Amino acid sequence: MTPQSSPSSSRDHVCLVCQDFASGYHYGVPSCVGCKTFFRRTIMKKQKYICQFEGNCPVDKTIRCACRYCRFEKCLSVGMDRNALQQNRDPIGYTKRTRRPKKELKTTSDCSSDEGASTPPSVSPLQLSPPPISPLLFQAAPLKPRRCILQTLAEREKCANDLRLSEYLPIRSLHEALCSKALLNDTAFLEKWGQPSERHQIFDLRFVNHDDYHYWHERDWFLLTEYAKTFDVFEALDYQDKAELVRHAAITVPVLVQVWNSPDYGPDTIVFPDGAYFDRTPEPTRPAGLNRKKYQMLDLVLKPFRDLQLDATEFAAFKAVTFLNPDADISLPARKLVNNERVRITKQLYGYMAMKDDVDTAIERFARLVLMGTSMSKMACESKEAVWIADFFENIGFSAFARQLFFGDTTSVVAHKL
């Protein structure tokens, strides 16, 4: 009995590996000719592949040739059975009757494997040429966890929000905040302080005042410093680079937190956890630049967030990418470290979105998210300029911590160096 089913049954299936049209049942599962051929060649030639990334590349009909390692892992995970191959009935390569002229081999690409062509082992940079491989390598096994980084970020975000809603808000300098232990990694601390305060519950809505802005910005800046310390790459930086990276994110990350955690009371309303809210209502007592920031939050962040309908995992990853910005005024070695971590998370985010939606939808949502980051960077530059102007004219009474965050803390830097 051959692995392939009758042609009539193939119309009812798609390929479980790449979601293309299945030509029938091959090696136990519905699959297309390309994935069937790829799986057979991998087993028969005892080929071994490696992934250039983290073993979580998307595999579908549009990019199934991108990573052979992840494609083969997908074949195994959906149930393709290597024992279904028959040595005498599954030859690899061309017979005398079907052998192609040599001149055509020159144009054979890696992706031609989907048409049943035999690709020379030396073509792919992902392919190794080791001694014969142990059969244990090909035993069916589940794929590596695809969301390990994103799951960590999502869990971290939940802890951060629990702390945001608690009573805990220490008074400390920026240097103390950045050099102390990471509270979000302290299980005992979170068990003690991770309960929501009665103050941070919505009983009724009231229009925001200056004290509300001050209170919630202080809380979100405190959370920003704690959030930063959860990244290993951040802890590897020297103090000056840490301070500059946090300073660069002092507008964008709190904006994301405030928008994401706001209950939906309409398209132009952001609500804090205690019921204070702001909308497009003019606030003549606030500096013009900060009023402009309010409108930008509604237009550039709130509306796109609601349109994209991000889930908690996507938000946590986007927040991390926003924070890990190599455009901050940090040293070159720090910039390389931060950028590498940012790229790593960005790849995971795209892979997650590609698994969640069809390819076209995933690409569109990912592109809109990236463009939103660009708009937020522009908003942050304008808002920081507004903060400097407000401080110059003494329109706002900044706390000592806020002044150190926005304008620098030379005393702490000197003390750190000593």
From Swiss-Prot:
DNA-binding region: 12-87
Tissue: Expressed in germ and intestinal cells and at low levels in the hypodermis.
Gene Ontology terms describing biological process: cell differentiation; regulation of gene expression; regulation of transcription by RNA polymerase II; S-adenosylmethionine cycle
Domain NR LBD: 170-409
Main location: nucleus
Function of the protein: Probable transcription factor which may have a role in detoxifying dietary metabolites arising from bacterial tryptophan metabolism. Required for fertility and involved in proper postembryonic germline development, especially germline stem cell (GSC) proliferation. Required for activation of the methionine/S-adenosylmethionine (Met/SAM) cycle in response to low levels of SAM.
Protein name, UniProt field: Nuclear hormone receptor 114
UniProt source species: Caenorhabditis elegans
Lineage: Eukaryota, Metazoa, Ecdysozoa, Nematoda, Chromadorea
Gene transcribed to yield this protein: nhr-114
